[in-house]
Amino acid sequence: FTRCVLGMVVTLEAPSAVSVGLCLVHVACDKRPWLEGLNVEMDWQMSGKPLLLYLDNAAEFKSEALRRGCEQHGIRLDYRPLGQPHYGGIVERIIGTAMQMIHDELPGTTFSNPDQRGDYDSENKAALTLRELERWLTLAVGTYHGSVHNGLLQPPAARWAEAVARVGVPAVVTRATAFLVDFLPIIRRTLTRTG
């Protein structure tokens, strides 16, 4: 609806119930302390506990942890129909837009083709820490939120502001750790006399 990026998590780990939980914390909590930690001055007001998650059928979105956490917090889960990839167009489009925004600007880019790359030494210039990448992606999100979206004919941030004016601000989670714990996997063990 707003086309806003509500949250993200940068990790070297494969997608999992844990990374989904971390991303939901980022979605639901006030981003100002996190932005200060990244030393980024921008307004990312899009936050709050979602009422609905529209997901594809990846294993991390079918986890017991996600189902349990969403049930505890009144978040409805809605899955894309199997074999219907066009239902994921909005999410796939934002990923494509993000990749287009960052591809030619990140240190070590390979550019679109060898002619465009020229003498640029991609391999020796490719050096970012995860924190630097997270900061860079955050700035890209800020640019995206403030740029006119072709489908909306207005910036996503303006669409968010209109929605908030109409229906109010979503409830922001203030206890991030407690919220995260509700979305973490549980491992069940049988206790015996010997351990």
State where each predicted segment sits.
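RNase H-like two-metal-ion nuclease catalytic core shared by retroviral integrases
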Residues: 55, 63-73, 78-121
